[in-house]
């Protein structure tokens, strides 16, 4: 049984709990069905085009482990705020939660689409180990985070296969929204392609229209026996070592 993804995910939870001194986690997952693809059929159509058979097999193995995390592993451990919504992405759920429900939230992601939320949360990038705030964003880009959807709509998003305006990348888009792009071909091209902006903005701006606000449950409790059961079932012996398990117990205030 492949368990590498599960182990890595749980280890990340432990490390985040230590770094931010919390046992409060909210997990948001992508739906397999995509309303964005209904709006724009080319959305993410590039994701599987050039993958080898081996890569497809690896993806399927990882998908099964992520499914097992969502049901049954995380609930068994005691986590209750685990959300998925048909047709919507984790980004949509995160966005509506931090805008309407969660205060002082730290969003853990390496997806720069979520930078638009920095006016109401902080973002921790697990790859760079960097905590991004509204202030650090404004210092780097010279605009408020609320402008990010407009910038991305102009530039497009290669990873999501959203085509922007030809010749306009993030740098040119930033110059344009600051009102500093000089007259010329690029500026004319932007004004002549308003239809692209009209198409892209609803795809990029978060949350997607129609996202329903999840209900946060506050009554989470974590029990030693449940953690032992999960760690033994998946043979996570390093988590069961005395020092490591004592850390788990302390971090999650287990009973």
Say what each PLM segment does:
Residues 15, 19-29, 44-50, 79-82, ...:
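Non-catalytic nucleic-acid-binding/docking modules located in mid-to-C-terminal regions
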Residues 1-108, 114, 119-131, 205-222:
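Noncatalytic, basic helical substrate-engagement surface that gates or grips nucleic-acid strands
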């Amino acid at each position: 049984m492949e368990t590498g993804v599960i182990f890595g995910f749980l280890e990340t939870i432990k490390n985040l709990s230590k770094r931010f001194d919390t046992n409060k986690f909210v997990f948001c997952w992508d739906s397999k069905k995509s309303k964005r693809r209904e709006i724009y059929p080319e959305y993410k159509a590039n994701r599987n085009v050039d993958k080898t058979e081996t890569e497809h097999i690896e993806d399927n193995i990882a998908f099964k482990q992520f499914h097992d995390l969502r049901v049954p592993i995380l609930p068994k451990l005691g986590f209750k705020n685990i959300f998925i919504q048909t047709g919507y992405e984790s980004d949509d759920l995160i966005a509506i939660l931090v805008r309407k429900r969660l205060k002082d939230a730290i969003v853990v992601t390496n997806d720069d689409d979520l930078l638009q939320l920095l006016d109401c949360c902080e973002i921790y990038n697990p790859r760079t180990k960097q905590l991004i705030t509204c202030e650090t964003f404004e210092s780097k880009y010279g605009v408020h985070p609320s402008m990010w959807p407009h910038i991305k709509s102009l530039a497009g998003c290669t990873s999501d296969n959203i085509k922007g305006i030809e010749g306009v990348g993030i740098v040119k888009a930033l110059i344009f929204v600051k009102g500093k792009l000089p007259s010329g071909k690029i500026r004319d091209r932007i004004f002549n392609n308003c239809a692209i902006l009209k198409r892209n903005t609803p795809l990029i701006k978060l949350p997607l229209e129609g996202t329903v606000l999840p209900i946060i449950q506050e009554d989470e409790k974590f029990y030693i026996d449940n953690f032992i059961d999960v760690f033994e079932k998946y043979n996570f012996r390093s988590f069961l070592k005395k020092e490591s398990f004592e850390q788990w117990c302390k971090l999650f205030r287990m009973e």
